[in-house]
Amino acid sequence: MTAMMITGMCAADVSAAEKKAVTDYQAYAANLDKSAYSGNDLGASYSKKATTFKVWSPNAASVRVNIFEHGSDNEGDAGSIMSRAMSLDKTTGVWSVTINGDLLNKYYTYSVTHGKTTKETADVYAKACGVNGQRSMVVDLSTTNPEGWKNDKHVLVQNQTDASVWEISVADFSSSESSGVSEANRGKYLAFTEEGTTVNGVQGASSTCVDYLKKLGVKYVQIMPFYDFGSVDESKNIMDQYNWGYDPVNYNCPEGSYSTNPKKGEVRIKECKQMIQALHNAGIGVIMDVVYNHTYTSDSWFQRTVPNYYYRMNNDGTFSNGSGCSNDTASEHLMFRKYMIDSVTYWASEYHIDGFRFDLMGLHDVTTMNSIRTALDNLYADGSGSQILMYGEAWDMATNCDEGTVLASQKNLKQLSDRIGAFDDTIRDAIKGSTGGTDCAFVQEGSRRANLKTGIAGQSDTTTGWANVPSQCVTYASCHDNLCLYDKLVGSVYGADGKYRKRYEDLVAMNKLSAAIVITSQGIP
């Protein structure tokens, strides 16, 4: 998401009038933190003989689990198969029930009652879900592994600065007929499994898709969100809809619109793994774009499960909105911190994800980000988890976090592990100017040299840089936000007379110079 360089409100940044010792909401969250659960068994734990359901909701009056044959009301006999009351362990705040029998691929929700209000919710810890993510699914993950998955390995680099990253979207990667991908797989996970694709499918034409990436020589692809998101109706054709996916619904389930059958929760899991496997077979690592800083709606599964706990709340009862997406999550609250750690390590271990790009990382706190780093470091006995990449958008943003919280923004980056990086907007703008305006910079007119030098050195200058070491600096000229590099050059050099579909040789040269700066700078290109 776009950088919004605004002053934060946490810790020392708040005004005296805003420094209320503890708000009612912060006291409420702190009290719930006393019941924080450390177990690793939240969600549905499946066996052929029985399935145990566990959900953390210490202040709920009652919780029931509802079992369904299908993932939505629009499929066959959509009525509930059964509903069972769950029991509360007051020492852990966890509600649980074990249901005998084989519930494989059955769907479920929870009915959670707070006071006199009961809301139905999916499971925040669900690892599989039905169409549009409205119901969770009981899954045996071992049945979702593609052939050869046991032999699939992480693609890692010894040093972070050895990485080279190319950003892609699952849909954009192959949605055009010109991609040469079969019609059935265009815009889907399985497009990555097709080999020998060329422009328009013409023999001898330029390579496309994974074959193109191999020729490009990149070490990693940073894939825009492919967890389950809410802005696309999975029951409809993906080619008729479009969204990047920065609107999370189910963090631990793959997005269904990218699968060949979004109504079957197990299908999206297997096909997502096939995508990752195909990239690994090509020698390319996968960096997952994760968006833990907000959810698609404020009436999320988190809010329905434990109201006003998982989010930063203003004193008037509204949601903090530093993200610009209407609800900032509260990474400083122990159970959302745990959730982020559990979610990242789950994707790394189950899906063999090789790196994580944290959207609006500056909204998360330093302790949580360092804890995620430690959890990844300890993920494997051979220590290879320490090579899983971590970086994010460390913009300084206004959010109403608990007093004393230190946010993972650029100004606090030196408090993060040296193996947590941040995007360098300074060199980005020094190369070609601001992301959307018509202003010029180094490649157009030779200006902004001081900022460029700092960026080339990986922001590690002791007086002006914000990084401990160059490996914390992600060097780039453009990304999915705002104008692409060439369009920026057209607008800044030729203004209103510029033709965006025309090839200007001087702009091509500027584009090449931009790439040369990124590739030869210290840091992660």
Model-predicted regions and their roles:
Residues 49-53:
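Structural beta-strand segments of beta-rich domains
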Residues 56-62, 481:
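Short proline/glycine-enriched turn/loop motifs at strand-loop junctions of beta-rich domains
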Residues 171-351, 360-361, 365-381, 401:
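Substrate-binding/active-site clefts of carbohydrate-active enzymes
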